Design a protein with these regions (language model features):
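Accessory, often C-terminal, charged low-complexity segments
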Residues: 1-138
Length: 138
């Protein structure tokens, strides 16, 4: 029976980043740059891998990570809502409002995840209006 107890201990192995390296020597036209924004994450990495890398970059590995559903989309809640990580596609203004209602201190989105530029700009405004200034896109 004692073998089934989860003590919350995680072991991580140091690996390379989940983000593809950028080749600054190549000249890209505007259309190619726009198309490349969807391919910044390495193919063999999961959203959970990316969530853990975000936690590492923020220095918050001692907080619990849980998967939640917000407005029908899966997000990662770090530290019981301290940070919300949304790596979804088609993020709408309604999705942003639902995340903002959780009152996180920090929010991370996928840069190309917003349904359009208007939704991204409204997200920035919504969080600033609520005093949530730590909003990033990867």
């Amino acid at each position: 029976m004692a073998n089934n107890i989860d003590v919350g201990f995680k072991v991580f192995k140091l690996d390379s980043t989940n983000i593809k390296p950028w080749d600054a020597t190549v000249k890209y036209d505007e259309t190619t740059l726009y198309d490349l924004q969807d391919y910044v994450v390495k193919e063999d990495r999961s959203n959970l891998d990316i969530a853990y890398e975000v936690m590492l970059k923020y220095g918050i590995f001692n907080m619990p990570l849980e998967e939640k559903e917000v407005n029908g989309k899966t997000v990662y809640s770090v530290g019981e809502g301290y940070m919300i990580i949304s790596l979804n596609d088609e993020i709408t203004t309604e999705d942003v409002a639902a995340i903002a209602a959780l009152s996180p201190k920090a929010v991370v989105f996928k840069e190309s995840g917003f349904v359009n530029d208007n939704a991204k700009m409204n997200a920035d405004y919504t969080f600033k209006r609520l005093g949530i200034d730590n909003v990033k896109c990867i």
